Amino acid sequence: MAPSEAPQPLPLCALEHQSLAIDLLLSMFPDEIEQTSSTATSIEHLRQYLDDPSQASPRLPHSVEFTLNLSIDPEHELQLHIRILLEQVNVDIGKDADADEPPLPVITFRCPTWMNRKTHTDLVQRMPLDSPDSILMTVEYLKEESTEYLATCAASSATNEPEAQATSGKLVRVWFYLQSLSTRSKRNDIVNWAPNYDLTGFVLAGKPGILCLEGTSDNISAYMSDIKTRSWSDIPSHQKKISERYREEGQHIERVFQNMREVTGEISKGGHRGNRGEMGEVRRMFEGVGLGEVFAEVLGL
């Protein structure tokens, strides 16, 4: 089998077009663009090559990447990930195409926490990605559609406010049991994303792992869906097992936690590999916030 050819930079004319697109993007969104030091270096290498195309081995990356944060209103924003390609995507396919025509940018629209998944999927499917001005057209399209979506949500919320307060607005405390939750970054997401859903509680890693959430049923469901689909997207489905062990609801339920926090470091470790929280300390932690009676319900002890 013949060895695959190394990726080749785009033709000079196409690279100039991509450079202009990058400059336009930076000039139009100076405060909304996030770029890393490596992105700035990549742009500098591109400009150096365009100033002196005679370089035998240009130090061009495969692409230049940006994160674009678009404000819809003071409380809502969108995030787009944009890649401007600098190499030929497929040399063989490109032989019959216009060699000077640059590849279209790759635009990824990340689902914001305030938008439901179905709406996000519908918007992604209708993004004008095939246009030569796809970035600007996508920005305008998403701003317009998101503004309309938020207005619809606000109107629906006002109409259904009494019913929502009677059902979804009730505070509940839900206890989840996890076989294991050893990855620190995943636990950080559990803690850091909770305020977006007005949730309080705690997470305890190890075997067993315990997750306690205080908030409305709707917010807890949306939060758990977000954690599973985004934070845990790289985890095999059979390892995402999490079960609701106990739910406290009723007029008497009040928050006992002031925020969302991780308590793993506060519990001594036991077990053969030191990955199981000492149950005596866990029980005392429950009792310390007035929840000693639910200890057996949660852990089945």
Swiss-Prot record:
Biotechnology: applications noted: Phomoidrides A and B (also known as CP-225,917 and CP-263,114) are potent inhibitors of Ras farnesyltransferase and squalene synthase. CP-225,917 and CP-263,114 inhibit Ras farnesyl transferase from rat brain with IC(50) values of 6 uM and 20 uoM, respectively. CP-225,917 inhibits squalene synthase with an IC(50) value of 43 uM and CP-263,114 with an IC(50) of 160 uM.
Pfam families: Prp3_C
UniProt superkingdom: Eukaryota
CDD domains the UniProt entry points to: RWDD2_C
SUPFAM superfamilies (alphabetical): UBC-like
Known role: Part of the gene cluster that mediates the biosynthesis of the antihypercholesterolemic agents phomoidrides which are dimeric anhydrides. The function of phiF within the pathway has still to be determined. The pathway begins with the highly reducing polyketide synthase phiA that catalyzes the formation of a C12-fatty acyl-ACP, starting from one acetate and 5 malonate units. The hydrolase phiM is involved in the release of the C12-fatty acyl chain from phiA.
Annotated protein name in UniProt: Phomoidride biosynthesis cluster protein F
Taxonomic lineage from the root: Eukaryota, Fungi
